[in-house]
Amino acid sequence: MNRLYPHPIIAREGWPIIGGGLALSLLVSICCGWWSLPFWVFTVFALQFFRDPAREIPLNPEAVLSPVDGRIVVVERARDPYRDVDALKISIFMNVFNVHSQKSPADCTVTKVVYNKGKFVNADLDKASTENERNAVLATTASGREITFVQVAGLVARRILCYTQAGAKLSRGERYGFIRFGSRVDMYLPVDAQAQVAIGDKVTGVSTVLARLPLTAPQTESEPESEPALQTAPVETAANPSAEQRQIEAAAAKIQAAVQDVLKD
């Protein structure tokens, strides 16, 4: 296990909100006493929501890690809409009490980032994957396998933040994005990946292994090479006489012609 923690325990995305809530709570406390209680509740909730603790990271090179905390809502064979290939799809739904920073599920190089505008339906629904605002990161793992992980906005979450771009190298567990206030992440893996979770399972970001992905793609069966055709000598037939036969026939024709000349004389 490896412990990766290159960021504060409270996500930077929450600093303005927490700072504002704290200042307002103190001000109302001084002026109005117990009337400040709702403001303190909001500030504590913001602290809880924007927490971003360090996690233990599995080092198995075949492990694909959960990029977020949450609950598994989809494990199925599906079509990766960004690569147009069959894939193993695993979706994680995050409620407002989960850690909402997104981290890389594997050591990989980002090849493309695709942003799509959309709606803000409940992220727990299947149609959220295709209808909601979303941001897809297409990447190639260190072993050359292609994976896709998609940030999907939700009913309350209306701000997707992505800090990576094409060409960037991400280490497993490295922070690359954030979605505020409830959302979803869809993972598309090669079809030979073996799911290690089931629908309903609770997962912990970068500590839970979602799937095992072989380092090399399965070999496709190649067609057997055809054997070279045997070269056979031409068959001698009446329509295809040999050179020796042609010589004999020519000599016989000459003799016959000579005999006919003698008879004429």
Curated annotation (Swiss-Prot):
- Active site residues according to the UniProt entry: 183
Enzymatic reactions: a 1,2-diacyl-sn-glycero-3-phospho-L-serine + H(+) = a 1,2-diacyl-sn-glycero-3-phosphoethanolamine + CO2
Q: Which InterPro entries match?
A: PS_Dcarbxylase, PSD-A
EC number of the protein: 4.1.1.65
Membrane topology for this entry?
A: Peripheral membrane protein
**Cellular compartments per GO CC:** plasma membrane
Pyruvic acid (Ser): residues carrying this PTM:
183
Pfam families linked? PS_Dcarbxylase
Example GO molecular function: phosphatidylserine decarboxylase activity
**Signal peptide coordinates:** none
Hey, where's the site called Cleavage (non-hydrolytic) on this chain?
A: 182-183
Write down how the cofactor binds this protein. Answer: Binds 1 pyruvoyl group covalently per subunit.
Region spans: Disordered: 216-246
Q: How is it modified after translation?
A: Is synthesized initially as an inactive proenzyme. Formation of the active enzyme involves a self-maturation process in which the active site pyruvoyl group is generated from an internal serine residue via an autocatalytic post-translational modification. Two non-identical subunits are generated from the proenzyme in this reaction, and the pyruvate is formed at the N-terminus of the alpha chain, which is derived from the carboxyl end of the proenzyme.
State whether it acts alone or in a complex, and with which partners, per the record.
Answer: Heterodimer of a large membrane-associated beta subunit and a small pyruvoyl-containing alpha subunit.
Question: What is the recorded function of this protein according to its Swiss-Prot or TrEMBL entry?
Answer: Catalyzes the formation of phosphatidylethanolamine (PtdEtn) from phosphatidylserine (PtdSer).
What HAMAP family does the entry give?
PS_decarb_PSD_A
What is the similarity comment for this entry? Belongs to the phosphatidylserine decarboxylase family. PSD-A subfamily.
Protein name, entry field:
Phosphatidylserine decarboxylase proenzyme
Q: Which organism is it from?
A: Neisseria meningitidis serogroup B (strain ATCC BAA-335 / MC58)
